[in-house]
């Protein structure tokens, strides 16, 4: 079976809602990690103090056939088509270990 990793970077405070909607679209779970950008547009100034905006990184592993509706729902829920709201990308998983307790991730030999 083929698996896909979906990674979305959204504004801080929005990940819980985005994950909730991704689950409604078929995701079985997600990992949320806090992060910050290093790009020039990430640093903002307030009273001559640099403030870096923090982000939430959402990571979802799913079966390939479930990936498209989950991806589409993340884009919709996170409003990722609006400029500056975040990014999303996917990549195939070639090796997977450690999710033995999750039936959908048991690899058949």
Question: PLM features: what roles do these ranges have?
Answer:
Residues 1-109:
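Positively charged, small/polar-rich N-terminal and surface patches that mediate targeting and assembly
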